[in-house]
């Protein structure tokens, strides 16, 4: 193991140890070189390069993976350039089912809570509804957008679906009937992502016009516009309690490339920014508290890095570089200690958080 150190202030060397997590399933063990940075409590930033074994499962997709989402504590659903939606057991390393029907790349997936059903969106302008326990054919096909569909969000009670597109339009659908019930359009509002606020009638939406909007699903009207950012907003995520949200910015060379924490309550102010990526931040998640002593968020970027941040202070606590993976496109929480990260070149990465000796994030499998 080669240890590189970049010190902000002098401190005695510390012992470095690594753990290996075994994941069962059809797999092959391979050696992988990975780089990560760790922000120690004494404010020293250590960059470490390690060679370790990780598990390579049978692949979920044969091309770039655009999106991944957790269906339940064992299964994820993903989509990509191969036009296929895949249900995968990431704990055993097995494909559960493949769903085919789209004519072009999958752009988004959204799962119905506590259900075996989920939706997919595509560059073919279609949205399809699938059932893990049904046939491999779509249960519903929703057609209403004039351009690629780039946003999907299911209401907390699972009765409605909101879709957004590059055609500047949002549509609200009745999940049972598959009929469109509301339509709204805002000039230059090229939708990049949608997220429904838990226990509320509100939908959060990011746009290429650099704006984060809050929509009221009752009539599908804009309820609030947050202050515009300097760069395209690529993604948004809402906390489980519905009090906060994160938006992500595109960028290059460290310009832009940040995530921003916003207050969704009365003030609706910007709370904190997370800066440290060097290319577009494509995804973000609020992490389960689990064993952590502080609230954490994670971001993934086109710079091949996943970062974990202190939600309250904006300090970067850990950086994992998934070398050779290309741009990281999507991030999802698998369980209390596991993350799923989709990539251009190496499929989906299974990452584990370890709190036993300070915070560490390790890649334990890829599929």
Swiss-Prot record:
Annotated keywords: Repeat, WD repeat
WD repeat residues: 53-90, 94-132, 137-175, 179-217, 221-264, 269-311, 315-353
Disulfide bond sites: none
Listed SMART domains: WD40
PANTHER family, A to Z: SPERMATID WD-REPEAT PROTEIN, WD REPEAT-CONTAINING PROTEIN 31
Name of protein: WD repeat-containing protein 31
NADP as UniProt keyword: no
Species of origin: Homo sapiens (Human)
Keyword Repeat applies: yes
Pfam families: WD40 (PF00400)
